[in-house]
């Protein structure tokens, strides 16, 4: 199956016709690749039984867009994809390697080894219910599918909260997604907003190049040492409970309630960088202002306020509850309760790399069983 970008003159005909396929996997990051791998293991063939569509221009998921100074030593652990170790591709002495180079190299090798035939760049614009099938509209044409594994992650949906005066600020407002290097801020005062791991990492870098102010909504709590596997399992269980109730999963920081007190964080504290201030009440033309009238001049406001799940293309399916969450079911909470033909892998408890691996397997098995799909060799011998 060859998928090409639709030319403008063919869009009207594309609206009438759709390529029929059993399953569409949307996204080719950790969650999407894991799901595709497990579909293959179950005997289903890419480009015949399922297709994998990825919006990114190259393998690597969101990792290919991360800032250059983010190395394998400073990221949360990158877990192996099923069937292929990470160190097979990047080696065991790779802490100083850029994450934006190493992980894409690993994903590319993985796609090739298992012949997953990812189609890119293909952007899914909308998914609609067409009775027994789901219509998946993309900028490369339409697909008619019996089921969907959605693995679109969060990178394309940065979250910036609304604050009074934001539209009149004369400086720059950026998000974590926009960050490249601290050198870009030399000679400027940067307000870093956010209390998560990314906020701490960027505050560390930027504060070594220029002056900073750090503000958070909640008082940050630090805990000794890195997070343990047991602690991680408790957090995953907490998030799983939320999504099974139809509640929004929340950010990692909001669920962990604390940040690891690493050597780098201790060094920041010794430098006086962790002088956290509460959230300001408004943004002015030249900076920020708190409720008591105190002002801080700023050239840049860097919003390290996280991301939201990239699910806008699923809006016509009306999967959300009144509170904004999606009620999930299934063994690992990947199946959408309102429409069991849809699995969200990388949402809620499967948002971590290790969670995505396990969830990809569960989604592949549960979805093919629900749709009563049989591998080609079984169909041909029946």
Predicted regions and their residues:
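Flavin (primarily FAD) cofactor-binding/catalytic cores of flavoenzymes
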Residues: 2-56, 61-64, 69, 93-382
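Glycine-/proline-rich flexible loop or hinge segments
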Residues: 86-94
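Redox-cofactor-proximal catalytic regions of oxidoreductases
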Residues: 58-87
């Amino acid at each position: 199956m060859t998928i090409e970008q639709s030319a403008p003159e063919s869009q009207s005909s594309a609206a009438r016709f759709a390529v029929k396929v059993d399953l569409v996997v949307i996204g080719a990051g950790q969650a999407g690749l894991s799901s595709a791998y497990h579909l293959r293991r179950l005997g289903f063939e890419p480009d015949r039984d399922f297709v994998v569509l990825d919006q990114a221009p190259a393998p690597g998921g969101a990792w290919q867009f991360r800032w250059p100074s983010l190395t394998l030593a400073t990221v949360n652990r990158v877990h192996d994809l099923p069937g292929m170790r990470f160190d097979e591709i990047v080696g065991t002495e790779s802490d100083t390697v850029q994450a934006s180079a190493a992980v894409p190299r690993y994903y590319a090798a993985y796609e090739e080894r298992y012949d997953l035939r990812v189609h890119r760049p293909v952007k899914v614009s909308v998914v609609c219910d067409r009775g027994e099938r789901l219509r998946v509209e993309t900028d490369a044409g339409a697909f008619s599918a019996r089921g969907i594994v959605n693995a679109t992650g969060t990178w394309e949906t940065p979250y910036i909260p609304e604050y009074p005066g934001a539209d009149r600020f004369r400086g720059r407002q950026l998000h974590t997604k926009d960050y490249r290097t601290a050198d870009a801020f030399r000679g400027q005062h940067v307000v870093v907003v956010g209390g998560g791991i990314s906020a701490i990492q960027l505050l560390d870098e930027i504060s070594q190049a220029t002056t900073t102010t750090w503000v958070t909504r909640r008082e940050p709590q630090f805990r000794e040492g890195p997070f343990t596997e047991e602690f991680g399992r408790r957090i995953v269980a907490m998030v799983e409970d939320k999504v099974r109730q139809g509640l929004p999963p929340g950010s990692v920081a909001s669920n962990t309630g604390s940040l690891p007190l690493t050597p780098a964080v201790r060094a920041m504290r010794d430098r006086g960088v962790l002088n956290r201030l509460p959230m300001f009440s408004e943004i002015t033309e030249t900076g920020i202002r708190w409720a008591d009238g105190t002002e801080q001049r700023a050239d840049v406001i860097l919003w390290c306020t996280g991301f939201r799940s990239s699910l806008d293309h699923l809006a016509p399916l009306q999967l959300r509850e009144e509170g904004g969450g999606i009620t999930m079911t299934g063994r690992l909470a990947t199946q959408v309760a309102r429409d069991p033909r849809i699995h969200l892998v990388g949402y809620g408890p499967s948002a971590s790399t290790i969670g995505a691996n396990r969830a990809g397997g569960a989604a592949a098995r549960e979805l093919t069983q629900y749709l009563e799909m049989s591998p080609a060799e079984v169909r041909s011998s029946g």
